Amino acid sequence: MTHSNRMLLGVNIDHVATLRQARGTRYPDPVKAALDAEEAGADGITVHLREDRRHIQERDVVLLKDVLQTRMNFEMGVTEEMMAFAEKIRPAHICLVPETRQELTTEGGLDVAGQEARIKAAVERLSRTGAEVSLFIDADERQIEASRRVGAPAIELHTGRYADAQTPTEVAEELKRIVDGVAFGVAQGLIVNAGHGLHYHNVEAVAAIKGINELNIGHALVAHALFVGFKAAVAEMKALIVAASR
Protein backbone atom coordinates (compact mmCIF):
# COMPACT_ATOMS: atom_id res chain seq x y z
CA MET A 1 0.00 0.00 0.00
CA THR A 2 1.21 3.51 -0.71
CA HIS A 3 0.97 5.63 2.40
CA SER A 4 -0.11 9.15 1.52
CA ASN A 5 -0.43 12.32 3.54
CA ARG A 6 -4.20 12.19 3.30
CA MET A 7 -6.07 10.05 5.77
CA LEU A 8 -7.68 6.96 4.31
CA LEU A 9 -11.10 5.44 5.00
CA GLY A 10 -11.41 1.69 5.34
CA VAL A 11 -15.06 0.58 5.21
CA ASN A 12 -15.96 -2.47 7.29
CA ILE A 13 -18.89 -4.34 5.71
CA ASP A 14 -19.33 -7.00 8.43
CA HIS A 15 -22.72 -5.72 9.52
CA VAL A 16 -24.19 -5.93 6.04
CA ALA A 17 -23.51 -9.64 6.43
CA THR A 18 -24.97 -9.54 9.97
CA LEU A 19 -28.29 -8.42 8.48
CA ARG A 20 -28.14 -11.18 5.89
CA GLN A 21 -27.28 -13.90 8.40
CA ALA A 22 -30.15 -12.83 10.69
CA ARG A 23 -32.54 -14.53 8.25
CA GLY A 24 -30.16 -16.82 6.38
CA THR A 25 -31.00 -15.12 3.09
CA ARG A 26 -28.83 -14.21 0.11
CA TYR A 27 -29.38 -10.50 0.72
CA PRO A 28 -28.18 -7.91 1.51
CA ASP A 29 -24.97 -8.81 -0.30
CA PRO A 30 -21.80 -7.51 1.40
CA VAL A 31 -19.98 -7.73 -1.94
CA LYS A 32 -22.43 -5.23 -3.45
CA ALA A 33 -21.92 -3.01 -0.39
CA ALA A 34 -18.16 -3.17 -0.92
CA LEU A 35 -18.44 -2.12 -4.56
CA ASP A 36 -20.79 0.72 -3.64
CA ALA A 37 -18.36 1.81 -0.90
CA GLU A 38 -15.50 1.91 -3.40
CA GLU A 39 -17.57 4.01 -5.80
CA ALA A 40 -18.33 6.43 -2.96
CA GLY A 41 -14.67 6.92 -2.07
CA ALA A 42 -13.65 4.10 0.27
CA ASP A 43 -9.90 3.49 0.13
CA GLY A 44 -10.21 -0.13 1.22
CA ILE A 45 -12.68 -2.75 2.44
CA THR A 46 -12.37 -4.47 5.82
CA VAL A 47 -13.93 -7.84 6.66
CA HIS A 48 -13.62 -9.99 9.79
CA LEU A 49 -14.05 -13.71 9.26
CA ARG A 50 -14.90 -14.78 12.78
CA GLU A 51 -14.43 -18.25 14.19
CA ASP A 52 -18.20 -18.43 14.81
CA ARG A 53 -19.04 -17.12 11.29
CA ARG A 54 -21.68 -14.80 12.71
CA HIS A 55 -21.51 -12.42 9.75
CA ILE A 56 -18.88 -12.69 6.99
CA GLN A 57 -18.51 -16.15 5.39
CA GLU A 58 -15.56 -17.65 3.51
CA ARG A 59 -17.42 -17.23 0.22
CA ASP A 60 -17.71 -13.47 0.81
CA VAL A 61 -13.95 -13.18 1.25
CA VAL A 62 -13.22 -15.22 -1.88
CA LEU A 63 -15.60 -13.11 -3.98
CA LEU A 64 -14.27 -9.84 -2.57
CA LYS A 65 -10.69 -10.81 -3.35
CA ASP A 66 -11.70 -11.22 -7.00
CA VAL A 67 -13.71 -8.02 -7.44
CA LEU A 68 -12.26 -5.28 -5.23
CA GLN A 69 -10.60 -2.41 -7.05
CA THR A 70 -9.03 -0.99 -3.89
CA ARG A 71 -7.72 -3.57 -1.39
CA MET A 72 -8.93 -5.95 1.26
CA ASN A 73 -8.07 -5.64 4.94
CA PHE A 74 -8.72 -9.12 6.35
CA GLU A 75 -9.32 -9.19 10.11
CA MET A 76 -8.74 -12.54 11.78
CA GLY A 77 -8.05 -14.27 15.06
CA VAL A 78 -4.66 -15.86 15.60
CA THR A 79 -5.72 -19.44 14.82
CA GLU A 80 -4.32 -22.14 12.57
CA GLU A 81 -7.58 -22.27 10.60
CA MET A 82 -7.49 -18.54 9.84
CA MET A 83 -3.79 -18.48 9.01
CA ALA A 84 -4.25 -21.31 6.51
CA PHE A 85 -7.22 -19.48 4.96
CA ALA A 86 -5.26 -16.20 4.74
CA GLU A 87 -2.39 -18.03 3.03
CA LYS A 88 -4.86 -19.29 0.43
CA ILE A 89 -6.65 -15.94 -0.13
CA ARG A 90 -3.55 -13.70 0.13
CA PRO A 91 -5.25 -10.39 1.01
CA ALA A 92 -3.24 -7.17 0.69
CA HIS A 93 -3.64 -6.41 4.38
CA ILE A 94 -4.20 -8.63 7.41
CA CYS A 95 -5.14 -7.34 10.85
CA LEU A 96 -4.79 -9.71 13.80
CA VAL A 97 -7.52 -9.19 16.39
CA PRO A 98 -8.48 -10.81 19.71
CA GLU A 99 -11.52 -13.06 19.45
CA THR A 100 -13.81 -14.99 21.76
CA ARG A 101 -17.18 -16.55 20.98
CA GLN A 102 -18.94 -14.55 23.69
CA GLU A 103 -17.97 -11.05 22.59
CA LEU A 104 -20.38 -8.89 20.61
CA THR A 105 -17.47 -7.33 18.80
CA THR A 106 -13.72 -7.13 19.26
CA GLU A 107 -13.57 -5.89 22.86
CA GLY A 108 -10.18 -4.45 23.73
CA GLY A 109 -6.93 -4.87 21.89
CA LEU A 110 -4.69 -7.85 21.30
CA ASP A 111 -2.31 -8.55 24.20
CA VAL A 112 0.84 -8.63 22.08
CA ALA A 113 3.16 -8.09 25.06
CA GLY A 114 1.65 -11.09 26.84
CA GLN A 115 2.09 -13.51 23.93
CA GLU A 116 5.00 -12.19 21.91
CA ALA A 117 6.30 -15.54 20.66
CA ARG A 118 2.89 -16.61 19.35
CA ILE A 119 2.19 -13.27 17.65
CA LYS A 120 5.71 -13.07 16.21
CA ALA A 121 5.32 -16.49 14.60
CA ALA A 122 1.95 -15.46 13.12
CA VAL A 123 3.31 -12.15 11.78
CA GLU A 124 6.28 -13.88 10.16
CA ARG A 125 4.11 -16.57 8.59
CA LEU A 126 1.49 -14.16 7.25
CA SER A 127 4.08 -11.66 6.01
CA ARG A 128 5.42 -14.37 3.72
CA THR A 129 2.15 -14.12 1.75
CA GLY A 130 3.09 -10.55 0.84
CA ALA A 131 0.46 -9.03 3.14
CA GLU A 132 1.04 -5.97 5.30
CA VAL A 133 0.24 -7.32 8.77
CA SER A 134 -1.18 -5.05 11.45
CA LEU A 135 -2.10 -5.70 15.09
CA PHE A 136 -5.28 -4.36 16.70
CA ILE A 137 -4.06 -3.02 20.04
CA ASP A 138 -4.87 -0.52 22.76
CA ALA A 139 -3.06 2.83 22.62
CA ASP A 140 -0.58 1.62 25.22
CA GLU A 141 3.20 2.07 24.92
CA ARG A 142 3.89 -1.45 26.16
CA GLN A 143 1.70 -2.98 23.45
CA ILE A 144 3.04 -0.63 20.76
CA GLU A 145 6.65 -1.53 21.59
CA ALA A 146 5.77 -5.23 21.59
CA SER A 147 4.13 -4.83 18.17
CA ARG A 148 7.35 -3.42 16.78
CA ARG A 149 9.39 -6.21 18.38
CA VAL A 150 7.29 -8.96 16.79
CA GLY A 151 7.91 -7.45 13.37
CA ALA A 152 4.49 -6.03 12.50
CA PRO A 153 4.86 -3.06 10.12
CA ALA A 154 1.51 -1.61 11.20
CA ILE A 155 -0.84 -1.27 14.16
CA GLU A 156 -4.50 -0.34 14.49
CA LEU A 157 -5.23 1.57 17.66
CA HIS A 158 -8.46 0.64 19.43
CA THR A 159 -10.68 3.75 19.67
CA GLY A 160 -13.52 2.02 21.52
CA ARG A 161 -12.79 3.56 24.92
CA TYR A 162 -12.88 7.02 23.34
CA ALA A 163 -16.15 6.17 21.59
CA ASP A 164 -17.68 4.89 24.84
CA ALA A 165 -16.51 7.80 27.02
CA GLN A 166 -19.44 9.61 28.63
CA THR A 167 -18.20 12.86 30.17
CA PRO A 168 -16.17 15.63 28.47
CA THR A 169 -13.28 14.83 30.83
CA GLU A 170 -13.35 11.14 29.88
CA VAL A 171 -13.55 12.00 26.19
CA ALA A 172 -10.54 14.33 26.50
CA GLU A 173 -8.55 11.71 28.43
CA GLU A 174 -9.25 8.96 25.91
CA LEU A 175 -8.54 11.25 22.96
CA LYS A 176 -5.18 12.19 24.50
CA ARG A 177 -4.42 8.50 24.94
CA ILE A 178 -4.97 8.02 21.19
CA VAL A 179 -2.94 11.14 20.28
CA ASP A 180 -0.03 9.93 22.43
CA GLY A 181 -0.33 6.40 21.06
CA VAL A 182 -0.22 7.63 17.47
CA ALA A 183 2.87 9.76 18.15
CA PHE A 184 4.60 6.88 19.94
CA GLY A 185 3.74 4.43 17.17
CA VAL A 186 5.01 6.74 14.44
CA ALA A 187 8.21 7.30 16.46
CA GLN A 188 8.65 3.50 16.56
CA GLY A 189 8.52 3.48 12.76
CA LEU A 190 5.08 1.88 12.56
CA ILE A 191 2.20 2.62 10.21
CA VAL A 192 -0.62 3.67 12.54
CA ASN A 193 -4.30 3.06 11.75
CA ALA A 194 -7.24 3.43 14.13
CA GLY A 195 -10.82 2.30 14.55
CA HIS A 196 -13.66 0.82 16.58
CA GLY A 197 -16.82 2.60 17.65
CA LEU A 198 -16.24 5.65 15.44
CA HIS A 199 -19.33 7.36 14.04
CA TYR A 200 -20.45 10.62 12.43
CA HIS A 201 -20.44 12.59 15.69
CA ASN A 202 -17.09 11.52 17.12
CA VAL A 203 -14.86 10.82 14.11
CA GLU A 204 -13.63 14.37 13.46
CA ALA A 205 -11.49 14.66 16.59
CA VAL A 206 -9.72 11.41 15.69
CA ALA A 207 -9.43 12.33 12.00
CA ALA A 208 -7.67 15.55 13.07
CA ILE A 209 -4.82 13.58 14.70
CA LYS A 210 -1.66 13.88 12.63
CA GLY A 211 0.07 10.61 11.93
CA ILE A 212 -2.94 8.34 11.46
CA ASN A 213 -2.81 6.55 8.11
CA GLU A 214 -6.32 5.08 7.98
CA LEU A 215 -9.56 4.92 9.95
CA ASN A 216 -11.63 1.73 9.80
CA ILE A 217 -15.35 2.30 10.26
CA GLY A 218 -18.26 -0.09 9.85
CA HIS A 219 -21.26 -0.26 12.16
CA ALA A 220 -22.05 3.48 11.99
CA LEU A 221 -21.89 3.42 8.19
CA VAL A 222 -24.21 0.43 7.87
CA ALA A 223 -26.66 1.96 10.36
CA HIS A 224 -26.70 5.33 8.57
CA ALA A 225 -27.04 3.58 5.20
CA LEU A 226 -30.47 2.28 6.25
CA PHE A 227 -31.71 5.86 5.99
CA VAL A 228 -29.57 7.47 3.30
CA GLY A 229 -28.23 4.57 1.22
CA PHE A 230 -24.78 2.98 1.33
CA LYS A 231 -23.00 5.24 -1.15
CA ALA A 232 -24.29 8.39 0.56
CA ALA A 233 -23.30 7.07 3.99
CA VAL A 234 -19.75 6.35 2.85
CA ALA A 235 -19.41 9.66 0.98
CA GLU A 236 -20.58 11.58 4.04
CA MET A 237 -18.05 9.85 6.31
CA LYS A 238 -15.26 10.34 3.77
CA ALA A 239 -16.06 14.06 3.59
CA LEU A 240 -15.88 14.39 7.39
CA ILE A 241 -12.50 12.65 7.49
CA VAL A 242 -11.04 14.63 4.60
CA ALA A 243 -12.16 17.95 6.10
CA ALA A 244 -10.94 17.14 9.62
CA SER A 245 -7.57 15.76 8.52
CA ARG A 246 -6.55 18.72 6.36
From Swiss-Prot:
Residues the entry annotates as binding 3-amino-2-oxopropyl phosphate: N12, R23, G197, G218, H219
The record lists the catalysed reaction(s) as: 3-amino-2-oxopropyl phosphate + 1-deoxy-D-xylulose 5-phosphate = pyridoxine 5'-phosphate + phosphate + 2 H2O + H(+)
Please state where this protein is localized. Answer: Cytoplasm
Q: Does the keyword field hold Cytoplasm?
A: yes
Pathway it works in = Cofactor biosynthesis; pyridoxine 5'-phosphate biosynthesis; pyridoxine 5'-phosphate from D-erythrose 4-phosphate: step 5/5
Its GO biological process annotations read:
pyridoxine biosynthetic process
Site (Transition state stabilizer) location in chain? E156
Family annotation (CDD domains): PNPsynthase (cd00003)
Q: By its UniProt entry, which Gene3D superfamilies does this protein fall under?
A: Aldolase class I (3.20.20.70)
- Which GO terms label this protein's molecular function in UniProt? pyridoxine 5'-phosphate synthase activity
Residue intervals passing through the bilayer: none
Residues annotated to bind 1-deoxy-D-xylulose 5-phosphate: D14, H15, R50, H55, T105
Q: Which UniProt keywords apply?
A: Cytoplasm, Pyridoxine biosynthesis, Transferase
Active site at which residues? H48, E75, H196
Please state the Enzyme Commission number of this protein.
2.6.99.2
Q: Which PANTHER family match?
A: PYRIDOXINE 5'-PHOSPHATE SYNTHASE
Q: What does this protein do?
A: Catalyzes the complicated ring closure reaction between the two acyclic compounds 1-deoxy-D-xylulose-5-phosphate (DXP) and 3-amino-2-oxopropyl phosphate (1-amino-acetone-3-phosphate or AAP) to form pyridoxine 5'-phosphate (PNP) and inorganic phosphate.
Q: How does it assemble?
A: Homooctamer; tetramer of dimers.
Q: Which HAMAP family would you find in this protein's record?
A: PdxJ (MF_00279)
Which family does this protein fall into? Belongs to the PNP synthase family.
**Protein's UniProt name:** Pyridoxine 5'-phosphate synthase
This protein's encoding gene: pdxJ
